Regions:
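Feature captures the catalytic cores and cofactor-binding loops of soluble hydro-lyases/lyases
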Residues: 2-119
Length: 119
């Protein structure tokens, strides 16, 4: 049985060490996901995201720091499908995604701050 945690409970428990003040939106079909976190810094360039998600991601979540840029998308449908094929649980992006109509039907957790059609 999986134990559920609410965001406010986690924030209360770890208030000394949490400093995220970003409003993420869900873009994928999976609303809940968890796993070991792998990080990547990718300001306005998704090549590293593509490279990482092309590898086995069993039980992992990719956390991408795109510096909050809304100039380009760091994830689209093709890279998201690749992530699913490689067993990733989800992707959290401090930046934008594209192909939102397709992303919302893919069985992948995807959170980002917005969408942008430019790659």
């Amino acid at each position: 049985m999986t134990k559920r945690f609410s965001t406010p409970d986690i924030s209360d428990k770890y208030s000394d060490s949490l400093a995220i003040n970003i409003q993420f939106r869900s873009f994928g079909k999976k609303e809940y996901f968890c796993g070991q976190v792998k990080t990547a810094q990718c300001p306005e360039d998704n090549s590293k995201v593509k490279e990482i998600l092309s590898q086995d991601g069993s039980g992992q979540v990719l956390l991408v720091d795109g510096n909050g840029s809304s100039k380009v998308a760091l994830l689209g449908d093709m890279i998201a499908k690749q992530a699913i094929e490689n067993s990733w649980e989800g992707v959290i992006i401090n930046g934008c995604v594209r192909d939102v109509e397709i992303l919302k039907v893919l069985s992948l957790g995807i959170f980002a701050i917005g969408s942008c059609p430019v790659r």
